[in-house]
Amino acid sequence: MSDTQDVNPATRRAAVGARRPFYRRRKSCPFSGPNAPKIDYKDVRLLSRFLSERGKIVPSRITAVSAKKQRELAQAIKRARFLALLPYILT
């Protein structure tokens, strides 16, 4: 017989749980730092990086933008939409 059938399932689970936990590196805000771009409603190319393919504003937990800069970014996107620089929805 094979040796794998003789192993206790509890010890197998313990061996699997003993692995090192997955470490996800914390992303930094793209608008923080010395060479960071300024958020401007006229910079359509920068603003469109933070819109989904449907035209919705991507949440900060995905883009790693800080809370303060996320509010500025949302305001700039809304201004650009109002001035017809960005679409409200993409079809």
From Swiss-Prot:
**Keyword tags:** Ribonucleoprotein, Ribosomal protein, RNA-binding, rRNA-binding
Q: InterPro entries annotated for this entry?
A: Ribosomal_bS18, Ribosomal_bS18_CS, Ribosomal_bS18_sf
Q: Name one GO biological process term.
A: translation
Spell out the coiled coil positions from the record: none
Name any one GO molecular function: structural constituent of ribosome
Q: Which GO terms describe its cellular component?
A: cytosolic small ribosomal subunit
Entry function: Binds as a heterodimer with protein bS6 to the central domain of the 16S rRNA, where it helps stabilize the platform of the 30S subunit.
Matches recorded under PANTHER family: 30S RIBOSOMAL PROTEIN S18 (PTHR13479), SMALL RIBOSOMAL SUBUNIT PROTEIN BS18M (PTHR13479:SF40)
Q: Which family does this protein fall into? A: Belongs to the bacterial ribosomal protein bS18 family.
What interactions and quaternary structure are annotated? Answer: Part of the 30S ribosomal subunit. Forms a tight heterodimer with protein bS6.
Q: What is this protein's record name?
A: Small ribosomal subunit protein bS18
Which organism encodes this protein? Answer: Granulibacter bethesdensis (strain ATCC BAA-1260 / CGDNIH1)
